[in-house]
Every structure is written in C-alpha cells, then in structure tokens.
C-alpha cells in the first residue's frame, strides 16, 4: 500500500511508518515478511522511514533515489537493502547510489557483520544504457528505472529475506 508524500522529510517518513503499523495491527500479516520500496522522492522518504524503524522491515528496495536516512540502525537491525540506480540517472546520478551502498557497507562492518553476511543483505545494481535498451528504455533513465519493479531476480532477492534470517 503506497503512502502519498506530505513532504520529503520526517513527516512523510513517520506517516509511512504509521501506515505499516496500521496494517500490522489490523490485518493478518507475517511480521517477519514486511517489505518496503521507495522510488525517487519516495526513496528519500522510505530510506528515512526504514532507518527510523528498521525493526519493522525484513528488506527494502531503494530505487533511483538518494539515501536520506541513517545507516547504523539498518545494520544494527539486519534489514536487507537492494539499491538500484541507472548508471546514467539524470536526476540523482549513480554516485549517490554508490555512496549509500558504501555507507551501509561500513555500517554493517561496524556492527560486526562479516563480508559474506553483508553480501547476503546488501546489494547494488547500477545498470548501463544497454541494459535499459534491452528493456525498451533508451532515454530518461531516471524515470525508466521503474523497470526494476518488473525484474524477477531483484524482487525475488527482496522477498527471500525474513526478519529472523537477517539478524546477525
């Protein structure tokens, strides 16, 4: 269930958390299999929400966005993160994805995770123009990045994680 942005800051992040909590309280939900995804501005918000309450989420798909949340809480709670950004994203640029990846990797190391454990819970993909062309996207790589939500390997990776499994 998508939340609509009120802002790109704490207000929307807290509303996303409240929506998650509402579903957990009012529907039959496997609490070990709660997932989040954020794309573009929604990724800025969801990176904040997931870092504010990483205990709620087994995995998070961070698409075509910059990371505005904290890093340490993600690692401390073992939340799996898949970062996806076009190599030539016109809006954010792929360097922001790599910066988030490196900061999350450092946070996992500081939390005592081994390299093998980290590789199981942290992934990044920054596909090139040819990868997008094979999927019918030949320009506007930022907007075209939404093809990630149709990539079975990415979605299966996210859905393969459970809260108990991720805890080190």
Which residue stretches match the model-derived regions?
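Gly/Ser-rich "nucleophile elbow"/oxyanion-hole loop immediately N-terminal to the catalytic nucleophile
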Residues: 5-40
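Alpha-helical scaffolding within the catalytic cores
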Residues: 18-19, 44, 64-74
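Alpha/beta-hydrolase-fold catalytic nucleophile elbow
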Residues: 37, 62-64, 84
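Short glycine-enriched nucleophile-adjacent loop
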Residues: 43-54
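A conserved short beta-strand
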Residues: 55-67
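Short, proline-enriched alpha-helix->beta-strand connector loops that line the catalytic pocket
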Residues: 75-81
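C-terminal catalytic histidine-bearing segment of alpha/beta-hydrolase fold enzymes
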Residues: 84, 90, 109-168
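Short alpha-helix in the alpha/beta-hydrolase fold that links the catalytic acid
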Residues: 92-110
């Amino acid at each position: 269930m998508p939340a609509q942005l009120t802002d790109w800051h704490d207000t929307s992040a807290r509303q996303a958390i409240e929506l998650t909590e509402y579903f957990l309280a009012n529907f039959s939900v496997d609490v070990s299999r709660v997932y989040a995804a954020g794309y573009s501005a929604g990724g800025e918000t969801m990176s904040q929400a997931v870092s504010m309450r990483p205990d709620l989420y087994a995995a998070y798909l961070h698409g075509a966005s910059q990371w505005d949340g904290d890093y340490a809480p993600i690692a401390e709670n073992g939340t799996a993160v898949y970062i996806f950004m076009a190599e030539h994203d016109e809006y954010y640029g792929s360097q922001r994805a790599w910066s988030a990846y490196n900061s999350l990797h450092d946070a996992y190391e500081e939390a005592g995770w081994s390299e093998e454990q980290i590789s199981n819970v942290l992934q990044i993909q920054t596909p090139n123009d040819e990868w997008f062309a094979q999927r019918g996207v030949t320009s506007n790589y930022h907007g075209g990045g939404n093809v990630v939500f149709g990539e079975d390997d990415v979605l299966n990776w996210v859905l393969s994680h459970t809260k108990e499994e991720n805890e080190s």
